[in-house]
Design a protein with these regions (language model features):
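Conserved small/polar residues in nucleotide/adenosyl-binding loops
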Residues: 126-131
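A generic local secondary-structure boundary/capping motif
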Residues: 6-7, 33, 105-110
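Leucine-biased recognition of intrinsically disordered, low-complexity hydrophobic segments
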Residues: 134-135
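Short, structured beta-strand-loop surface elements
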Residues: 52-98
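Short, basic/aromatic recognition patches
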Residues: 1-12
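Short beta-strand segments
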Residues: 10-47, 65, 76
Length: 136
């Protein structure tokens, strides 16, 4: 599903968006710094502050994300399904280390606390038609 051509869009150069929906249909869109590559069928989001997103996902495990390739400006849409959360291990440690580095560089040490690495299955990944039209 996730190919080499998608990797630049998963490096965190441009913010990404995640949209979730509560069980009663109320949507919530949040801008996030990065969507992490886990393997060709999974991505992870850092769970820090997203209380509304986390609540929505507990009610409805499906989400929609958009990532952007910084070199081509192509946008890719990902249809996701929550799989599991990790609160320790290699993925969690890698995400926590990067989060702490970002906090340190922005003068926000101690503000960001990674609570979990939320892992999602990528159900569908496709190019945004609007980006294709803009890029010709």
């Amino acid at each position: 599903m996730i190919k080499d051509k998608h990797m630049p869009a998963l490096q965190g150069m441009f913010p990404s968006w995640i949209t979730s929906c509560s069980s009663d249909g109320e949507p919530n869109t949040t801008v996030i710094s990065q969507i992490w590559y886990v393997d060709e069928n999974h991505v992870a989001l850092s769970f820090q502050f997203f209380n509304k997103t986390k609540k929505n996902i507990s009610e409805n495990p499906y989400a929609y994300a958009t990532i952007s390739d910084p070199s081509t400006l192509k946008q890719y849409n990902l249809e996701l399904k929550f799989d599991h959360e990790e609160t320790e291990g290699e993925l969690f440690d890698e995400m926590d280390m990067k989060l702490q580095a970002i906090a340190s560089m922005t003068g926000m040490t101690g503000i960001f606390k990674l609570r979990a690495a939320d892992v999602y299955k990528v159900c569908l990944l496709y190019t945004s038609d609007a980006a294709d039209e803009l890029l010709g």
